[in-house]
A protein has these predicted regions:
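A short glycine-centered flexible hinge/capping loop motif at secondary-structure junctions
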Residues: 142-144
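Membrane-water interface segments at the C-terminal ends of transmembrane alpha-helices
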Residues: 1-3, 18, 23-129, 146, ...
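Short alpha-helical segment that forms part of, or immediately flanks, the ligand-binding pocket
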Residues: 136-137
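Short hydrophobic, aromatic-rich alpha-helical segments embedded in or entering the lipid bilayer
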Residues: 7-22, 186-190
Length: 190
């Protein structure tokens, strides 16, 4: 049996669902896509939460440039991102720790992360702008340092934006076909 060999399935049976979960040939690509999407969400959050905080707090030329760079992938099709990654990482370079990433496992999570940055940043920026500045000032006046205030006051108040952005990005990357088709290798079949 093969899953979805016809354009329209003839019938939805328990056998088809059973096959998805029993045969590793069918289940492994699904789990691989889940893992790569989750990696992209985590990497994107690590980048965008602090950047959203800094950009929202200070409106200077450097922060506007950072915002522009993070939002740039939104204006590019997925195929352009994939082709540029192929050109960048097809040979050994300092950016790839002196290895070629093409055909390896990490090229797809990197591509998904780049693809996800604008959506995550937008969600986190809106969440950051909705935080009452008095909360941060109160925390600082009570003796908490910048880092403690960030982790104990800012991040919990940003959590609805962080979660909604993470869910949207996860859904968007798990269904991304163009980059997957251009960048997959033996170790990362989506």
């Amino acid at each position: 049996h093969s899953i979805m060999t016809d354009i329209f399935p003839r019938e939805f049976t328990i056998e088809n669902y059973q096959m998805v979960f029993e045969k590793s040939r069918v289940l492994k690509p699904m789990l691989n896509s889940l893992k790569m999407s989750l990696m992209a969400v985590i990497a994107g959050l690590i980048i965008t939460v602090p950047v959203a905080y800094v950009v929202t707090k200070n409106n200077n030329i450097h922060n506007r440039l950072a915002k522009f760079i993070i939002m740039l992938p939104w204006s590019m099709p997925a195929s352009a991102i994939a082709v540029n990654l192929i050109n960048t990482f097809n040979q050994k370079s300092i950016f790839a720790f002196n290895k070629s990433l093409i055909g390896g496992f990490y090229i797809l999570p990197i591509a998904y992360t780049i693809y996800a940055l604008p959506l995550l940043f937008s969600s986190n920026e809106v969440a950051m702008k909705s935080i009452n500045l008095g909360l941060e000032e109160s925390s600082r006046s009570l003796g908490a340092g910048k880092l403690k205030t960030f982790y104990n006051v800012i991040i919990p108040n940003m959590m609805p934006g962080i979660i909604s952005g993470a869910i949207l990005v996860f859904i968007r990357t798990i269904g991304e076909y163009t980059m997957s088709a251009l960048l997959y290798g033996v170790y990362n079949r989506p």
